Amino acid sequence: FAFGFYPEAERWRAWMVLVTPPLLLLLAMAPDFPGRRKVLVGGFCAYPVLAFALLAGGVLGLAAVPSEKWGGLLLTMVVGIGAFVFSFPIAILLALGRASKLPAIRLIATGFIEFWRGMPLIAILFMSVIMLPLFLPPGVEFPRLTLAMTGITLYSAAYLAEVARGGLQSVGRGQSEAANALGFGFWAMQGYIIMPQALRAVLPGIVNSAISLLKDTTYVMVVGLFDLLNIVTAALSDPAWLGLATEGYVFVGLVF
């Protein structure tokens, strides 16, 4: 259930990927730990890249493991956390674009958000994993996991953008006027004054979006990826697991 088809000899790498997020959270909650917020933010930003390099291998003498062998709780964590981290900066840009005074930028951002929010996630996965490869040039192929994560990332970015836009609207106009009076440029004003207040105001909404995204990762089973739920379903066809369906689904329920 935890690792899917990941090679047993290389599962120490999978263990490192699974235990890193809880360790980061514990460090962030330690009151006496210096720079705990920087560790939390920096750790989760670097986590998807480092996790992918560690799991895929092919670097630093690590044996290469194709993404087709990733599965179970491991795949659920990689897709959920990876898609959230990659979608967050896109969502910030979309929120700023939708609040822009420039009509062209506002129209593009609004169109992007409304398009992806209006598409069911299952349809997005089907188009990105099944249909998109049909239009690629011969010899150009991408792993199904990469295509699925791309679709989920764009889908998540559209919803997070609306959460971030709500935070921007909660910040008083006087904040930006004061920043302009002090000589702050647009990006400095957003980075140091506006965005920290906006994100703090909508932190519960961001957490809800992250939890919802983690649960939505179960949809990858429709494109043949063995996430936690799909690996349990597949294991029940093994004679060794006959009669243990309840235990498997209870475990999935506890995780989610």
List the model feature ranges, each with a label.
Residues F1-F256:
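Transmembrane alpha-helices and adjacent helix-loop boundaries
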